[in-house]
Amino acid sequence: MSIRIIPQDELGSSEKRTADMIPPLLFPRLKNLYNRRAERLRELAENNPLGDYLRFAALIAHAQEVVLYDHPLEMDLTARIKEASAQGKPPLDIHVLPRDKHWQKLLMALIAELKPEMSGPALAVIENLEKASTQELEDMASALFASDFSSVSSDKAPFIWAALSLYWAQMANLIPGKARAEYGEQRQYCPVCGSMPVSSMVQIGTTQGLRYLHCNLCETEWHVVRVKCSNCEQSGKLHYWSLDDEQAAIKAESCDDCDTYLKILYQEKDPKIEAVADDLASLVLDARMEQEGYARSSINPFLFPGEGE
């Protein structure tokens, strides 16, 4: 199955009246998203060997919250949705959508917000980004979208991505359309922007017990059935790993068909669990999965592979 976004004027009457039994897509809910992430990162930093880095990530998340409301985006995406729907492509496809200068405006605003909080190497990094030319910044963004991580140092990537993520999340929040599940491929990528997930979440509330993958760029969540590999869609050779016990709130789902894994977070076991924060705070589990010979099928927006990784 794949997910396609349909323009409002192409929806059938039943689709306009009611949601699907299982919502295939949950557009980003930006109100307090970044503040909640920052709070969770600070909470997880206590008694965590990665505490300093989690607090650093919390500073970026808090800055995203401030910049989000200081620099709103106004954009009519109606034509873009129609074109993408006709082509069967993600409407905000990172590989083809022209980037507006708004994202660089967001980056400069993030740097201004973060400067008073930074020191040492981190301060030097954002000052270098502040001095970079428009083209240099665009080249770094293009490299990240192409997964050419050797072209962007791992200390610069989180700041560049934080601005790009804000821009894409703002656009995703403006999409005038509805998602429809259809037969197709590439469910492992975000149906809104084509980026990778950061982790998956088994939710509570109106989507109780359903698994949604969380986009590491536009913050959209999309449904993928449980007990199926989110990367290759096979189901015969799945295994579940945790550092605690079978009731752990965070597990890794590995697949022996493609030798990859993705973390599954369970809200029913910890209602405060957060897709980005808890993924970052559980890197010990990633180390274990690497020892077992599995490759990660996702990327955390605060932790990019460096050159040679």
UniProtKB/Swiss-Prot annotation:
InterPro entries: FdhE-like_sf (IPR024064), FdhE_C (IPR056796), FdhE_central (IPR056797), FdhE_N (IPR056774), Formate_DH_accessory (IPR006452). Its main location: cytoplasm. The keyword Isomerase does not apply. Keywords: Cytoplasm. GO terms for cellular component: cytoplasm; cytosol. Coiled coil: none annotated. It holds the Pfam family FdhE_central. SUPFAM superfamilies: FdhE-like (SSF144020). It comes from the Bacteria. GO terms for biological process: protein maturation. Gene3D superfamilies: FdhE-like domain. GO terms for molecular function: ferric iron binding; protein homodimerization activity. Signal peptide: none annotated. The keyword Cytoplasm applies. It is found in: Cytoplasm. Belongs to the FdhE family. PANTHER family: PROTEIN FDHE. Necessary for formate dehydrogenase activity. This is Protein FdhE.
